[in-house]
Amino acid sequence: MARKNQKILIIRNDKIGDFTLILPAVVSLKENIPNSTIVCLVSENVKELAEQCEFIDEVIVDTKNKMLYSSLKRYGFDIAISFFSTFRIGYLLKKLDIPIRLAPKTKLAQIFFNYKLYQQRSSSKKPEYEYNIDLVHELFKIINLIDIKEMSLGPYLKYDHATITENRMDFIKEYNLNPDKKIIFLHPGTGGAAKGLSLDDYGNICKGLRNFDDYNFIIHCSVEEEQLARDLKISIDKDVTIRVIEAKQSILYMLKNISICDMFIAGSTGPLHIAGALNKKTVGFYPSKKSSTSLRWQTINNFENRLSFTDMKNNKNYISIDIKKSLLQIQKLISSI
């Protein structure tokens, strides 16, 4: 296929974290087919985030109704890549008669795609973002694209330095922080995940890190998690000065706040993956389930900026870690240049 100004539809229409993990693949797509128009179909809660991605040209919300067909039909797409195939989306792409329809070779939905890649993602043999990159590289084979550029490193979501500096100073003033000390965000919410770190262990991490330096601790949360955040604050207020961020229903607000922190500590949730896309230093806590490993759901920040801990399975309700060993590793990461 000649590489004209191709119109490419990419689909990841579910959660924030899942969408974030397609960003390296989409960057590779844009860098190798620079004249393409990339349109991204996303869920409503991801729309604001997708619109911040400079390599995505247009964003369409999956309305899940008959109007979606008309909205997509007008583009005349040459290519569609569904990073997660569902029967509804597969049928829609087939109905649109898009010449190249590519998806993972899984489930019944694969019957609607004329190009498929067998991946077996549940085996967790590589990071999710690499499975996504593999799909894009499969497209390059299909269109006979050679001389593929090496994948760019993060950040995949960007703010210019002046904006971050201004936002950081505003944040420090709003929350009365020490401007000379690093800002550490802790996000105790699990976002619906089965297990997360206990509030006691989040508290132990704060108290342990405070022994190294007088860090600024901020509890980050969504609107739904405000009470959990306040419970954490109450549990450690006597030992550590810690503040709860004002929660709002806004991805842009979350993005702006996370962009100013020096480290983000959380379970495998959407906010952790946003921090990774911003190339922040991240500390993630993962269950020991095969389909939820730290390798599979690795953040997309640079290697030297990420640290992960896997559940030692000492507690059926919470992820358990060796606090003393973990503290030393976390302190080493935050003190690195």
Regions picked out by a protein language model, each given a short descriptive name:
Residues M1-I337:
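Catalytic machinery of carbohydrate-active enzymes
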